[in-house]
Regions:
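Amphipathic alpha-helical segments
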Residues: 9-131
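Sec/Tat signal peptide C-region and signal peptidase I cleavage site
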Residues: 3-9
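Short, exposed beta-strand-loop hairpins at the edges of beta-sheets
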Residues: 135-139
Length: 152
């Protein structure tokens, strides 16, 4: 008897390919471009430090035999300082970029979750599972395209 009740109360289930929806998000490209713009000055600063170090290394290699010991030592110290500065700033940029990327992704995934809920409510689904947790699902239960449309 308990089985009959469970069968009668069958839930309507769908699945969504969140990765596919994420790739199709129009906001994703906008966020990516904004992040590149926001971090451009720091990336340019790193390129400048690299160029300065390269110039000094080339001078040391090219003119090393013509330079006095004091000049050689000064160039080596300058190169070491530039290398250290580069490493510190590159690490800071990497951390800031990764943190910002995580924040932006979280916002985008929240947008996707809201769209999934909207589509599920509209179509009467009781449960929506991400495709990554699914062994098999009939294509007609895939609501990914509906979610993508809801986001545009």
């Amino acid at each position: 008897m308990a089985f009959a009740n469970a069968a009668e109360a069958a839930q309507k289930i769908a699945y969504v390919n969140t990765a596919q929806v994420f790739q199709a998000l129009p906001q994703r490209e906008v966020v990516l471009q904004k992040m590149q713009k926001d971090f451009k000055s720091k990336a340019d600063e790193l390129k400048s430090i690299q160029a300065q170090a390269k110039t000094k290394i080339e001078k040391l290699q090219r003119d090393g035999e013509l330079l006095g010991q004091e000049e050689i030592e000064k160039l080596r110290i300058d190169i070491a300082k530039l290398d250290s500065e580069y490493k510190v700033k590159a690490q800071a940029l990497e951390k800031a970029s990764a943190r910002r990327e995580a924040e932006e992704k979280a916002k985008l995934f929240k947008t996707i979750q809201d769209a999934v809920k909207k589509v599920a409510d509209k179509k009467g689904y009781d449960l929506v599972i991400d495709i990554s947790a699914l062994q098999y699902g009939k294509p007609e239960y895939n609501i990914s395209e509906d979610v993508i449309k809801a986001l545009k």
